[in-house]
Amino acid sequence: MTRIPLNRQSASVYRAYLDAAAEVRARADDAGLSRAVLELVNLRVSQINGCAFCLNMHSKALLEAGDTVQRIAVLPAWRDTQLFSDTERAALEIAEAVTWISEAHLDDDEYTLLREHLTDDQVSLLTWSAITINAFNRVSIMSRYPVRAEK
């Protein structure tokens, strides 16, 4: 069955999401968050949600941002490695808390630990980043965006 391409059917709504994501990226840069940290969030959320289109897109973006195949490969088990910085670990905690919000709220102690490694602006922007990629995952999955073989 052919799915409704939500990005085209409701183009103005989709454009608003794109604009929101662009604003998050711009403000994140101002707040000292690298594109690589944002892409880690994008990739981890996409792994959890099982969005093939976004996994393909954000694994490439992470490599382009200078990350390694090794770190991408172990990202689902990031807690079991020493390959991620404290800032990245805090970002990944936020990504997972937002994505699994019905199951895994950050308690006050966990939230306090995040703030040892992130500024208020960074916490806010990483949360917005996780919110926006969760929305994009859902659009991509519901629309069944294809992943085409690379040549």
Residue spans for each PLM region:
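Hydrophobic alpha-helical segments
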Residues: M1-K151
